[in-house]
Regions:
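Active-site-proximal substrate-binding groove within the catalytic cores of carbohydrate-active enzymes
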Residues: 1-155
């Protein structure tokens, strides 16, 4: 019996190999409960993956299509929604995942090698951790303050 998945693979390979941890996470923006998949993607550090006409699509599962101009227009909106969400954390794709901490039943923190932290809140209510407010069913990305470099110090 599984109580909770932990991103072991991502802790080893994130920053080296792109990943989508579960088949159910393809075309997530087309799913009715996309918020849950979107949060899992943020927690596991994966990028969105979209496929047209996948043979693995089961009847009755939501999917994206491009058979008509209307379907294409709708699917482009779905893909754009996923890309916009990923833009919030896309800079982390080249950094190693250093830590994954379960802070509570519905709150997790993923820490990256550049010091960035992603707080994911699966709860229906806002939560706070480490002084970071995370809205209900959302995530927050906290990036470290930029450190001065030798070249920036010379410019002063």
């Amino acid at each position: 019996m599984i109580d909770r998945y932990v991103p072991f693979w991502q802790l080893v390979y994130h920053g080296i190999v792109l990943s989508t941890p579960f088949r159910t996470m393809w075309n997530i923006e087309a799913k009715p409960d996309k918020w849950r998949y979107r949060l899992c993607a943020a927690e596991y550090g994966n990028r969105p993956t979209f496929y047209y006409y996948g043979r693995w699509n089961r009847p009755g599962e939501p999917d994206i299509h491009c058979g008509t101009p209307e379907e294409l227009a709708e699917s482009v909106c779905v893909i754009k929604e996923g890309a916009d969400d990923y833009a919030r954390r896309s800079d982390l794709q080249y950094h190693f995942m250093d830590r994954h901490d379960i802070l509570g039943k519905d709150l997790v923190r993923t820490t990256y090698s550049n010091g960035a932290r992603v707080y994911v809140n699966y709860a229906d209510v806002p939560q706070t951790a480490d002084g970071v407010a995370v809205p209900a069913r959302d995530y927050a990305v906290v990036r470290p303050a930029p450190q001065p470099t030798a070249s920036s110090a010379r410019r002063r």
